[in-house]
């Protein structure tokens, strides 16, 4: 496995699609809101003694899928992208918060699981897969009677080093139930390592990290995504304007950008942190990114913290962030943790 990825977390978090499209984004709650711990909590039910990191996420719903990179399948060798389902339940009367595996599995969960399983068959190889990011395309009619006549269409982005360096690739099932074979996004990739794509809220481009200029920095590719014809856009080989984001990058390694709303979160081992890789955030305002701010000692440690992703959660007074860390007290290697953070504006 390539040295730059040894400690990397790759998370992808997404809500069950029926919940995404059925639930309003802004609710008025007639009861007390829930609260996520502002001290990191180990997600023991997801972790193993191996390295578990790198996730991706989408919004809404109390049950959601979490895709992340793990070397559990190879007993510590190469990394694959795996998925688990997470259930968040808050009892407004008892104030009990449950975060764990789903207590009940219905047809929606089974259909989503089938879709994820089929995607992983196309994504995973004998090389290392990292940095999953999922774009949901909604439900479509299925010819498979086992899926109640529907299937979930998605585009999955990830990186893979089967050519010797990390390249960003994608699989999709926009027009057919089975996912296509993985294809490279040629306008992003170089002979260096390119990974961890994320998109701005204006649909005007995507951010990613690369060591094409030496150390890892954060880059922006100007691409028009307003039509949301993702497979066609990612298959385009036309050269794009790509620039290093000096306001976000440092002389050290800056990796794993993830954007939600006007906020970018990422990992960096720049000076001034608490040791190893720390988590930082930046706000986009008046056409530019603010100076990155360290999340502080309540989240960061002298060990490594990697690949943060945030999920908005209605009915709570803060948002839900998942990240990876090799801090002491876990199951071994890198574990996944969650922590409550200040709500990100819509």
Where are these regions (language model features)?
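N-terminal hydrophobic targeting signals that begin at the initiator methionine
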Residues: 1-2, 336
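Short, conserved micro-motifs composed of acidic
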Residues: 24-346
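Bacterial N-terminal signal peptides that target proteins for export
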Residues: 2-12
């Amino acid at each position: 496995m390539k040295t730059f990825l040894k400690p990397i977390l790759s998370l992808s978090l997404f809500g069950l699609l029926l919940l995404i499209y059925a639930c309003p984004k802004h609710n008025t709650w007639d009861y007390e809101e829930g609260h996520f711990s502002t001290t990191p909590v180990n997600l023991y039910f997801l972790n193993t003694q191996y390295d578990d990191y790198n996730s991706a996420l989408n919004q809404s719903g109390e049950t959601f899928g979490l895709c992340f990179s793990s070397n559990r399948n190879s007993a510590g060798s190469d990394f694959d992208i795996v998925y688990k389902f997470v259930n968040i339940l808050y009892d407004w009367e008892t104030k009990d918060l449950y975060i764990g595996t789903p207590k009940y599995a219905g047809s929606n969960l089974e259909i989503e699981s089938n879709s994820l399983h089929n995607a992983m068959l196309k994504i995973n190889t004998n090389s290392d897969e990292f940095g999953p990011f999922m774009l949901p395309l909604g439900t479509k009619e299925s010819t498979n009677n086992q899926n109640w006549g529907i299937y979930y269409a998605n585009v999955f982005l990830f990186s893979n080093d089967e050519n010797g360096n990390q390249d960003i690739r994608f699989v999709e099932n926009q027009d057919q139930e089975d996912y296509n074979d993985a294809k490279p996004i040629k306008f992003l990739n170089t002979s260096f390592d390119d990974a961890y794509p994320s998109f701005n809220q204006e649909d005007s481009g995507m951010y990613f990290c690369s060591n094409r200029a030496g150390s890892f920095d954060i880059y922006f590719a100007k691409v028009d995504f307003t039509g949301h014809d993702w497979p066609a856009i990612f298959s385009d080989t036309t050269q794009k304007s790509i620039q290093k984001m000096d306001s976000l990058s440092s002389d050290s390694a800056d990796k794993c950008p993830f954007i939600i709303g006007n906020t970018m979160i990422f990992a960096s081992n720049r000076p001034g942190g608490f040791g190893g890789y720390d988590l930082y955030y930046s706000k986009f305002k008046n056409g530019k990114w603010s100076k990155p701010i360290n999340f502080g000692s309540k989240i960061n440690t002298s060990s490594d913290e990697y690949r943060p992703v945030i999920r908005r959660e209605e009915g709570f007074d803060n948002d839900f962030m998942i990240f990876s860390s090799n801090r002491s007290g876990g199951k071994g290697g890198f574990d996944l943790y969650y922590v409550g953070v200040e709500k990100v504006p819509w």
